[in-house]
Amino acid sequence: MKKLILSISVLVVGTMAYAADKTAKPIADINPPTVATEAEGLAAFQRIYEVASHPRCANCHVGDDNIPRWSGPSYAPFPPGQDWKYHGMNINADVSRIGVETLPCSTCHQTTPDLKSESHAPPHFGIDWQLAPVEFEWFGKSASFICNQLKDPDRNGGRDWMGLAHHLVDDAGHRGPVLWGWKPSGNREPAPYSLQQHVDDMVVWGVAGQPCPSEEE
């Protein structure tokens, strides 16, 4: 009888959790406008670029050297002539981008839905800490480069602009790096604007045809 009661309790709790999950309000809304001009799309992308190139995003969107960066005011001082430095402790995430070959990122960066961490303590979020795929290299890249990368399915995970918007909302819903970018805690500077504004800009840029600035801009 006790086993039956326990089984029923687990079933009820599981069903309630599933129902709550299915009806919970998304952490950000995706509401594409009916129309958007090229000028509006370019303005939206400029704000997207400000987010993508910000230290909270770009520091882990690095190239095939697989070394995360430390940039932004909380990581000063920097080497002469630079506004950034390599991650301390000789960290290299290797080809796996999670450090499995040497020292996993999760050794210091916990996986926990609690985004709060002390200043200069390893930050953490709700999914395993890792570098973004190398195709998503943003650190030190121009607005034109990042724009063309984001609109290229071969370099953005096979997504169209709506897929990119859903990626932002889904990642944030799992309390991943997207949400952490605006809630980094400690003395870390958050990404500009807000998650909702970023999603709004993504869909405006998409409806406008994903226009990109020229390299000179």
Language model features: what each stretch is:
Residues 2-43, 55-58, 63-73, 199-217:
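Post-cleavage N-terminal segment of exported redox proteins
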Residues 20, 141-151, 158, 214:
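Phospho-regulatory, low-complexity terminal regions
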Residues 30-51, 81-96:
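Electrostatic cytochrome c docking/interface patches
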Residues 41-48, 53-56, 101-104, 142, ...:
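Stable alpha-helical elements in mature extracytoplasmic
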Residues 53-64, 100-113:
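The canonical Cys-X-X-Cys-His
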Residues 69-106, 115-150:
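Gly/Gly-Pro-rich "capping" loops immediately C-terminal to redox-active cysteine motifs
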Residues 156-216:
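C-terminal capping alpha-helices of c-type cytochrome domains
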